From Swiss-Prot:
Lineage: Eukaryota, Amoebozoa, Evosea, Eumycetozoa, Dictyostelia
Signal peptide positions on this chain: none
Record's compositionally biased regions (Low complexity): 515-524
UniProt KW keywords: Membrane, Transmembrane, Transmembrane helix
Subcellular location as annotated: Membrane
Organism: Dictyostelium discoideum (Social amoeba)
Name of the protein described by the UniProt record: Putative uncharacterized transmembrane protein DDB_G0293652
Amino acid sequence: MLSKIIIIIFIVINFINIIISSITFDIDCRDIINGGINPSSSSSNSNSGSDYSGEIILNLKNKECKDYHIEELLNNYYIQNNNNNNNNIITINGNETFGTTIIQSKKQPFLNLINDNSNNSTTTKSISLNITINNINFNNWITPILYMETINNNIDFINTNFNNHSNEILISYPIISNNDSNDNNSINKTLNSINLNNCKFENFNYLTKLNNLIMPIKLKQTSISVKTSTFINLSMNNTFFHLNQSSLTISNCSTNNITTNNFSFITLINSPTIISNYNHSNSNGSFINHINNNNDLIDFSNENMLIEFSNFNNNLILPQPQPQLELLEQRLQQLNNSDYNNNNNNNNNNNNNNNNNNNNNNNSFNENINGFIILDCENKTEKANVLFYSNQFINIMPYNINFNYSIINIKNINLILNNNNIINNINSNSNNNNSGIISKANFNNQNLIHIVNSNLTLIDSKIESDNPIGGEYSTVYIDSPSNDKIGWNKSNNTNSSDDDDSNSNSSSSGGGSGDNNSIGSSDNSKNKNNKLEWCFDCDGCVFSISTDKNVTLTNSDICPDPDAPNNSNDNGNGNGGGSGKKSYKNTILAVTISAIGIICVALLLTVVILKRRNRKSSFDYLLINQYYLDDEEEKRELLLNRNNNYYYDNNIIDN
C-alpha cells in the first residue's frame, strides 16, 4: 500500500512539474516588455501581416528555454510586411549574469530571416532589422543560430556564448540570387552587418564525415566585426570563418587549440580584413587564407587595407605553409585525373621547354601566382614584428610557376625566418619519368625577396637559387641600404662625409652610423670599387644574395666578426669611425673577460696551494710510520701533537 502511495505521489509531482515548466516557458521565454505584441494571438493570423514597426524587447529570464524560436515573431511582424522602416528594433536579453540563460534548439534556427515566398517572389527583401542579443548561452546547437536570406540587417551578439556545437553552420550568409559571383566590383556592396562583442566560441566538434564542408561562420556580402572574443577547443575539417565579398575586422581576440585539418582558420575571398591585437596559438593549419584574383596572397598594406596585422603580442606566428600551396595541391589532384591528363597532356609538355625528354610525362603544367607574401607596414610608426617558423615557401614541385611578385616583399617589418626553406628554380636530375618534371619558378623580372626599410634575420634557414635570375632582379634585392638592417655593412669607403649619428656612443669622429647593425657605414656613392656592401648575420644559413650593384654574396661572405678592427680610416675628418655602440659593447666585453680570467687564476692558485699542503702532510705521515715503527710512544706523540695536525690512524696506534 505504501509503495502505491509513493508511486501516485511521484506521478502527481511530475505532472505538476510539467505544468509549471510549460507555464514558466510561456511567461519567461516570451515576456515582451515593450511593444504590446502578443505572439500567441498573432500566430493564428500569420498570413495577414501587421503594420507594426517599433521596438520589441524580449527578456528571456528562464535559465533553459528549450526549443524556443522567435522566427515566428519576426516573420509575422517584419518579413511578410517587407517593412523598410529603420526603427524596427528587436532586443533579446538573457539574465544579467553572463552565460546563465541557456537556449538549446533541435528544430529551427534561432533567428530565421527568410524571404516571403507567398507571392512566388525570389527577390531578396530589405527589412532593415536591428537585432541585439545580450547574455545568451547557445548550448548544444545543431541548427543555424542565424540564417539570413533578407538584407540590410544589423545583428549584434553581445556577451554571447556558443558552446558544444556540431553538425551545422552557426551563421550563414544571405542567398544573393541576382549577384552571386566573385566579381571584385561588388566587394563594397555589403548587405548585412554582424557584430560579435565579448563572445566565446568553445568546444566545437565538426569532425564527422558528413561535415567536411561545414564552416561555422559562412558569410557573403556581409560586414562582420569580432571584438574581445575567444575561440577555444574548436575541431573542424574546414575553415572557421569563410567570407566572400565581405569585410572582416578582428581586434583583441585570441584562438587556442584550434584544429582545422590543415585548412586556414580564416578564408577570405575578395574580402578586406583588418586584424589587430590578436593571439593565435596551439593550433594547426595556417591562420589566414586570402584568395583574391587581383591581389596578393597576404597583404599588410595600409593603403589597400586588404589584410593588416598589428600588435600580435609582439610577434605574428604563421606555423604552416602558406595557403597558396593549397591551390597547387588542387592542381596536382587535377593532374591525377585521367580526363584532365588526356586533355592537357600536349599543352603541359609543350610549356616545359627545359624537359623535352619527358614529353610523355603528365605531371607538368604552368601556373601563375600573383605573389606570395607581401608584408607592407610602410606607414606605421613602428616596425611590425613577424616570425615565420618552419615554413616551406616553395617545395620541390612538378610545376612551371610564374610569380608576378616577390615571394617576400617587406616594408617596415622586423622579419625573422626560423627554420625556413625558400627555394627557387629547383630542377630534377632524375631520369625516372614517373618522378615528375621538376621545373623552375619564373619571377617575371621580380626578386625572390625584396626588402625596404626592414630587418631580416635568418635562423637555420635556406635561401637558394640554382639558376640565378640575373640583372638587378636578384635573389634578394635591397631597395634602401641606408635604412635596411640585414647583418652588417662591410663598405670600405674612405671618402665619406661626416655623418656621425647623433645617437652614437663612438669615441671617434665622424664616419659611422651608430646603428647596432652597422659597422663603419658610410656613403658609398663616391666609391664604385666596393666588392661587398652587405652581408647576412646568419646562423647556419645557406644563401645567395645580390645587391642592386649585382654583387653576389656566397657562403664565404658571411658577416665578419663584429669585434674585428674596422678597415675604415679615422683621420679626424669624418672618415671611417665605426659603430660607436659596437665599440662600447666591445669594451664591456673585454672588461668582463678580464675579470673572469683573474677569478679563474685565483681559484687555480688556491687549489694548487691546498693540494701541496695536503701532499706535505701526507708525506709527513708516511715518514712517521716509516722511521718510528719501533718506538710506539714516540710515534703516538708525533701522530697526536706534531704541529697540532691529527693524522690519527686507529689501526697503527692500537697496534
